């Protein structure tokens, strides 16, 4: 299955890294007008920076040596004007580039989130929640530095560099050639520093994903952690990953810190040679102090843009490492998509047909040669030992997965030939693990039923036996129920989930062990609500407690991915086959549980 592949980033080399960088720059295309204005500001700021070095010659020769009073007025005024205009350009350039960078990050994060939403369930089984969260947050943020900061430095510092090089060649081409000998020596170390930084950045992002996954697991599973007294163990696991992240961060700082002194050392060699030769020229009388110091000022001013350009390579490498991971998801083609000629599925009126289907996950067979017809309005329960394939079979109907072979039809329409939205609008789901959102009770009930009225929400809550406890909450229907509904009991969460399904009013209903985790009192209230929900609907029940499916129209027994029996409850018991064995096994377990309960009391 295509969707079973993970989103592990490929290893990119040479031209591929350049392609990624170009792809990042293309994200700025919609912002071309702002980028053009920012670029003009950067060019002006770069030119004005180099003009300061140009003014050193007239300042020294005309003011201090020739004592020209007129120049004493104009040069200070020119310097003030240069700094004023340069400051304004730098401000507007920073604001514009920051907007472009943040806008690109927001758009990229939206694209990434939308792409994740398109993936099938197999994608999520391959990619932990924490890793995906890290991609959307940390990896996307690393791209922002490349798009705005690195591009700004490349444009502004490169132009400043060109202007300053022009000044030093204009002032003394012989000294300029001596200075230029040093620059080629920097190319190799810059490349090596960049390679190391990219490697560390990739490892840092992987470790950050692992840390986020660990954090998400332990916080969501905090009850189990405490129940099994594993706090110390989890603290150690977190500390190990955190320590690894700290060492990688220090390594990144070390690489950055080492690159600057190395460049300073090479620059120092060049400046020492220039002072020796330039001083000799002044002593000999073939040059003036103003010319030499103008040259030297331009050369010293070259240091900062060169330093930033060496560091910008590290920023780019960090961004490319993050982009590899982000694009590895954005470029994934979802398994489950609408066909070009997909049609709308009418409301079910006849039957669901499952024709000779098979399904494999990672080449491991899960379902084999399943044939089943479910009439509209029929209640069909699926039972079997854990791993028998009952949940997988039911998940194929809303196309959470696609069949490996065979077909599923609703009223004669192959579900692969209809649009996903029209298919899934026909299906309501209530699961054992109730998923609620950190929002109000009202919005959780109305989830997926946009435009419904307050009256409809309350009617759905009443039908789900939820209205009475809702009105007793602090804010009633406006009460925010916490992450995953943690402020509510299991039975209360389940009844809100049932109210949500009632409000959706879908003709097909999937109940995935909806009462298996509830106590007896809560189960009775939920079961009553479920019976109202099931009325008049085609219902597929994944059952754990066989006592809850006695009244099903038909019970389907799956063993190792195959249907071995089907029929009504009493009929299957009379056959003394697999269903009878399951019933007897559960009856014994229930009896033992009752005995233990009596002894405890």
UniProtKB/Swiss-Prot annotation:
InterPro entries: AAA+_ATPase, ABC1_TM_dom, ABC1_TM_sf, ABC_transporter-like_ATP-bd, ABC_transporter-like_CS, ABC_transpr_lipidA, P-loop_NTPase, Type_1_exporter. It is an enzyme of class 7 (translocase). The chain crosses the membrane at residues 35-55, 77-97, 150-170, 173-193, 263-283, 286-306. Residues 36-318 form the ABC transmembrane type-1 domain. Gene3D superfamilies: ABC transporter type 1, transmembrane domain (1.20.1560.10), P-loop containing nucleotide triphosphate hydrolases (3.40.50.300). It is a multi-pass membrane protein. Keywords: ATP-binding, Cell inner membrane, Cell membrane, Lipid transport, Membrane, Nucleotide-binding, Translocase, Transmembrane, Transmembrane helix, Transport. ATP binds at residues 384-391. It holds the Pfam family ABC_membrane. Coiled coil: none annotated. It catalyses: ATP + H2O + lipid A-core oligosaccharideSide 1 = ADP + phosphate + lipid A-core oligosaccharideSide 2. One of its GO terms (molecular function) is ATP binding. It is found in: Cell inner membrane. Its EC number is 7.5.2.6. Residues 352-585 form the ABC transporter domain. One of its GO terms (cellular component) is plasma membrane. The keyword Thylakoid does not apply. The keyword Transmembrane helix applies. In MsbA the ATP-binding domain (NBD) and the transmembrane domain (TMD) are fused. Belongs to the ABC transporter superfamily. Lipid exporter (TC 3.A.1.106) family. Involved in lipopolysaccharide (LPS) biosynthesis. Translocates lipid A-core from the inner to the outer leaflet of the inner membrane. Transmembrane domains (TMD) form a pore in the inner membrane and the ATP-binding domain (NBD) is responsible for energy generation. Homodimer. PANTHER family: ATP-BINDING CASSETTE SUB-FAMILY B MEMBER 10, MITOCHONDRIAL, ATP-DEPENDENT PERMEASE MDL1, MITOCHONDRIAL. This is ATP-dependent lipid A-core flippase. The lineage of its organism: Bacteria, Pseudomonadati, Thermodesulfobacteriota, Syntrophia, Syntrophales.
């Amino acid at each position: 299955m295509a969707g079973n592949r993970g989103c592990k980033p490929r290893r990119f080399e040479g031209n591929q890294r350049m392609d990624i960088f170009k792809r990042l720059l293309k994200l700025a295309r919609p912002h071309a007008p702002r980028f053009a204005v920012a670029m003009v500001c950067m060019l002006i700021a770069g030119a004005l920076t180099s003009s300061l070095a140009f003014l050193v010659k007239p300042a020294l020769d005309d003011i201090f040596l020739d004592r020209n009073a007129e120049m004493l007025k104009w040069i200070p005024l020119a310097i003030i004007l240069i700094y004023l205009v340069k400051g304004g350009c730098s401000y507007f350039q920073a604001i514009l580039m920051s907007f472009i960078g943040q806008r690109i990050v927001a758009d990229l994060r939206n694209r990434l989130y939308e792409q994740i939403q398109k993936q099938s369930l197999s994608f999520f089984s391959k990619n932990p929640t924490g890793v995906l969260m890290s991609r959307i947050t940390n990896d996307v943020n690393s791209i922002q530095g490349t798009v705005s900061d690195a591009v700004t430095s490349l444009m502004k510092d490169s132009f400043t560099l060109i202007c300053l090089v022009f000044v030093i060649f204009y002032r003394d081409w012989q000294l300029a050639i001596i200075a230029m000998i040093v620059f080629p020596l920097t190319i190799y170390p810059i490349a090596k520093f960049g390679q190391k930084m990219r490697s560390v950045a990739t490892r840092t992002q992987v470790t950050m994903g692992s840390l986020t996954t660990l954090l998400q697991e332990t916080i969501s599973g905090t009850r189990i952690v405490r129940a099994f007294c594993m706090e110390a163990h989890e603290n150690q696991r977190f500390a190990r990953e955190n320590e690894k992240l700290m060492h990688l961060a220090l390594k990144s700082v070390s690489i950055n810190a080492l690159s600057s002194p190395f460049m300073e050392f090479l620059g120092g060699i060049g400046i020492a040679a220039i002072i020796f030769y330039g001083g000799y020229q002044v002593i000999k009388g073939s040059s003036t102090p103003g010319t030499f110091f103008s040259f030297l000022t331009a050369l010293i001013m070259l240091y900062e843009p060169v330093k930033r350009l060496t560091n910008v390579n590290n920023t780019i490498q960090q961004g490319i490492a993050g982009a590899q991971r982000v694009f590895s998801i954005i470029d994934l083609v979802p398994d489950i998509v609408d066909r070009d000629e997909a049609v709308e599925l009418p409301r079910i009126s006849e039957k669901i047909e499952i024709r000779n289907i098979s399904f494999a996950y990672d080449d491991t067979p899960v379902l084999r040669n399943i044939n089943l017809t479910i009439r509209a309005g029929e209640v069909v329960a699926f039972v079997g030992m854990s791993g028998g394939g009952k949940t997988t079979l039911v998940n194929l109907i809303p196309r959470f997965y696609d069949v490996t072979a065979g077909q599923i039809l609703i009223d004669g329409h192959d579900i692969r030939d209809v649009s996903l939205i029209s298919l899934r609008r026909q299906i309501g789901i209530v699961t054992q693990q109730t998923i609620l959102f950190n929002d109000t009770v009202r919005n959780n009930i109305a989830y997926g039923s946009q435009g419904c009225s307050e009256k409809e929400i309350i009617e759905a809550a009443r039908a789900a036996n939820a209205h009475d406890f809702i009105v007793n909450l602090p804010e009633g229907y406006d009460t925010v129920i916490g992450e995953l509904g943690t402020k509510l009991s299991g039975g209360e969460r389940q009844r809100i989930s049932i109210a949500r399904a009632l409000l959706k009013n879908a003709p097909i209903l999937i109940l995935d062990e909806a009462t298996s985790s509830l106590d007896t009192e809560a189960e009775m209230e939920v079961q009553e609500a479920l019976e109202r929900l099931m009325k008049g609907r085609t219902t597929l029940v994944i059952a754990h407690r066989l006592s809850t499916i006695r009244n099903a129209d038909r019970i389907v027994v799956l063993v190792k991915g195959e249907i071995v029996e089907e029929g009504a409850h009493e009929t299957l018991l009379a056959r003394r086959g697999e269903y009878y064995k399951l019933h007897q096994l559960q009856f014994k377990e229930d009896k033992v549980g009752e005995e233990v309960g009596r002894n405890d009391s």
